[in-house]
Structure formats: C-alpha cells, structure tokens
Amino acid sequence: MSQELDYPSSLSAPTSRKAETFSYLPKMTTDQIKAQVEYIISKGWNPAIEHSEPENAFSYYWYMWKLPMFGDTDANVVLAEVDACIKANPNNHVRLIGYDNYAQSQGANMLVKRGDM
C-alpha cells in the first residue's frame, strides 16, 4: 500500500497556496491557455474573467471583469480581454471561467495569472 504524503500548503504561507484547476501544474503557456479557451467555447459555455487581490482571494467574492462573453466564439477575443484585465490589475489573481447554461454552473474554472504575493 502506498504511503500518503502531506502537501506543505498553508493559508498562513501565501506562496504555498494552491487555487483552482491546474494550480499544482507548471504555469500554463499562452498556447495552453488558448487551448482551454477553445475547449470552453467548443462546449458552448460562456467565457468570463474575474480578478481579486491575492490577500482576499480565499475569503471574498472576486470582481467580474466586464460581463460574461455570451456567444463569443473567437478565442482571440477572449484572450485579448484576459490580457486587458491583467494590464488593468497587474498585482491581482486573474481567472478564466466557463459558465455552462445547461447545468447552470461553472464548467471550467482556472487561474490564468497568479498575482504578486
């Protein structure tokens, strides 16, 4: 039987915190983020962008960047909005969400930029 290992993550140590899908993997490249956006669009989900200060990310609501991109089918438009959000909020966490209208929930949720801690 394999031994269970403890992961050294703590809310008191900001640099050890993990958040959202893919946070245990290396940072995604622009092409990998674009592939995720294309997946969200291919499922018919509505992309949305949110951001939050790192110190508030785990205990408060995140700010929505504009409105969800209802019916947007161009990944480059979504990526341009992600870049605009990052430029306007350079120290914040930025996440990409795919809202599933049918299930009335989030189909995808991932950090695309980790804020300075």
Curated annotation (Swiss-Prot):
Q: What else is known?
A: The basic functional RuBisCO is composed of a large chain homodimer in a 'head-to-tail' conformation. In form I RuBisCO this homodimer is arranged in a barrel-like tetramer with the small subunits forming a tetrameric 'cap' on each end of the 'barrel'.
What inducers act on this gene?
Both mRNA and protein accumulate at 2% and 0.03% CO(2), but not at 15% or 0.15% CO(2) (at protein level).
Q: What is known about what this protein does? A: RuBisCO catalyzes two reactions: the carboxylation of D-ribulose 1,5-bisphosphate, the primary event in carbon dioxide fixation, as well as the oxidative fragmentation of the pentose substrate. Both reactions occur simultaneously and in competition at the same active site. Although the small subunit is not catalytic it is essential for maximal activity.
Q: Enumerate the UniProt keywords alphabetically.
A: Calvin cycle, Carbon dioxide fixation
HAMAP family (UniProt xref): RuBisCO_S_bact
Question: Belongs to which family?
Answer: Belongs to the RuBisCO small chain family.
- Output the Gene Ontology terms for molecular function: ribulose-bisphosphate carboxylase activity
- Quaternary structure (record): Heterohexadecamer of 8 large and 8 small subunits.
- Cite the Pfam families for this sequence: RuBisCO_small
InterPro entries from the entry? RuBisCO_ssu, RuBisCO_ssu_dom, RuBisCO_ssu_sf
Q: Which GO terms describe its biological process?
A: reductive pentose-phosphate cycle
Output this protein's name: Ribulose bisphosphate carboxylase small subunit 1
- Superkingdom field: Bacteria
Q: Which SUPFAM superfamilies match?
A: RuBisCO, small subunit (SSF55239)
